[in-house]
Amino acid sequence: MKPVQLTIDGRSVSVSPELSILEAARLNDISIPTLCFHEALAERGSCWLCIVELKGQNRFIPACNTKVSEGMVVETDNAELRGMRRQSLERIIDQHCGDCLGPCEISCPAGCNIPGFVSAIATGRDRDAMAIIMETIPLPGILGRVCPAPCEDACRRHGVDDPVSICALKRFAADRDAAAPEPFMPERKVGSGKKVAIVGAGPGGLTAAYYLLAAGHGVTIIDAHEQPGGMMRYGIPRFRLPAEVIESDIRPIREMGAEFMMSTSFGSDTDWTTLSRDHDSLLLSVGASVAARMGIPGEDAPGVVSGIEFLKRAAEGDAGEAGKTVIVIGGGNTAVDAARTALRLGAESVTIMYRRSLEEMPANSLEIGEASAEGVELRLLTAPTEICSDPEGLLVRAVEMRLGEPGVDGRRRPIAVEGSDFVLKADLVIAATGQAVQVPASGLPGLGIRQDGTVMVDEVSMQTELPGVFACGDCVSGPELAILAVGQGRRAAQAIDRFLTGLPFEKPPAVFNSSYGERDHAPAPFYERAKPASRVDVPELSPSERRRSFEEAVTGYGREDAVSEARRCLQCRCRAIDSCHLRELAGEFGITSSMESRPDGEFAIDGTQGARFEREKCVDCGICVRTLEQASSGTADFRVLIESCPTGAISG
């Protein structure tokens, strides 16, 4: 059959007259969007995304259903076509309902594929679980113990019974791997010959080091402490985070060749001028290790110590005895850690004094509960006004508080109750009312510093005002969670890698994300389909066993418990997220979200026939129906249906 000549986007092409415009375009590497087209099917759908313009005829036609003809002039892309396609896509998206990413994954500052590693544990694939975790969190043993788990707050399992113990499962994977004959090591690219200096051996700096080393770059880590780990080592007590766990997480970084310059203060012992002689870039990742002042008389009296200093001395084995009576001032994790540490150092009475209510205490609620179980007393709505030296120790003058109107931060302001003054005696007062960043700017002349003392960086590149100098972690965000520093460390490593390889910095493209919305907003049948199963308790020492011991208080899951807990996961993450054509097209057309999506009809997930069909994700493209109709037997292999579904409505 004689070929026909036509013009597509100004290009003259010669094709068989049996082809559609869409097939002719694809044959010539011209892309036309479509959801309902499948090359193996004779019958076509009607998504109207493949609409094109016939020039000279002022006609808009579907490219998948229109045969080519001699002399045809086709335009596949212009502003009018894009507008029409976007309208069609928005109509289709309105029919599509479900979560692209699980709420747990969205809430994780590091962006960890939580459903992925939990599923791997549930099916006994420990190595796969570790590999998935290490894609975003290279310190899993540490974070599996100390992360406050915003992911668990977001877990949709709340709508059934209790959230999945995500952190404990991450710890399980890390501990299993650490005990394996050959622990996980990432594949490392060929050496680039480039070298990066990292100032700070805390979560952000270690994370950046891990990914830069894996990318083939050399890394030198500079830190003022004797050992790496930053506040994870010197600010978190050993009964929560054993030193051997820190070493286990750092092992891959050492084995990939990182150089450590410990007991080295940046700015006094070395600076960027010196380091730049044999380093191509620098990352500043210092933590918030300076104690905030309380602003009351007597806070510098003998017997008053900051929470940071107290925990550091305890980590170094130099804290001495705490005395019989200890008062800790503050309500964060440092305050709770200091109180629990004081008990283990022999204190008979430990009191946490906090100026707001229990609901507003920023410390992890689990840690507060464990402290209370060990015998720590909470004196809430109480604030110190003065600390005085006394022949028998210290006197803490305090006042009762009430909560007033919300301040600029949205929190209700504590107000002193007139005439409520009282005095408490103490042998030791630990001040843990906050932390601040002290950037070693003397080592980086010209570094831009904000009024709050944090470093100014470009939001996209994380580069400072100094070329080749980047920053991440607390020195950028202010005092924050370790998991946030991990997320920033990975982003910084990616940006530095682009800098070292000469690639331009690029803002990540906006990605479409369909979601049922907030944690409890999925359709009722979504929760009802799950069988109730109580959260598996994480084994721990009893309060009487642990209150005088620095042995790790929480002992962690064994295999049976871990698998049982992992199987509670609802697997909210779409199974087709990496191959969803609808998500890809939505991103191309700048449609970034479909929040609070709801099924038009009855919610249904059917997994009884060997494949899983989720009706609410179906956009009626018709590919599966046409596949079955075209098959001579009226049946088709599920794998064919799964691979051809453009939205993940059919999955394995």
Question: What do the predicted segments below correspond to?
Answer:
Residues 138, 202-203, 227, 332-334, ...:
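Residue-level detector of alpha-helix initiation sites
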Residues 300-323, 409-479:
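FAD-site-proximal beta/loop scaffold in flavoenzymes
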Residues 262-273, 381-392:
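A conserved short coil-to-beta-strand element within the FAD-binding core of flavoproteins
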Residues 196-218, 335-343:
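N-terminal Rossmann-like FAD-binding beta1-loop-alpha1 element of flavoenzymes
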Residues 173-189, 248-268, 291-345, 450-460, ...:
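Glycine-rich dinucleotide-binding loop and its adjacent helix/turn
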Residues 218-221, 225-256, 260, 312-314, ...:
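Rossmann-like dinucleotide-binding cores of NAD(P)H-dependent redox enzymes
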Residues 1-195, 243, 282-300, 389-393, ...:
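Ferredoxin-type iron-sulfur electron-transfer modules and their immediate structural context
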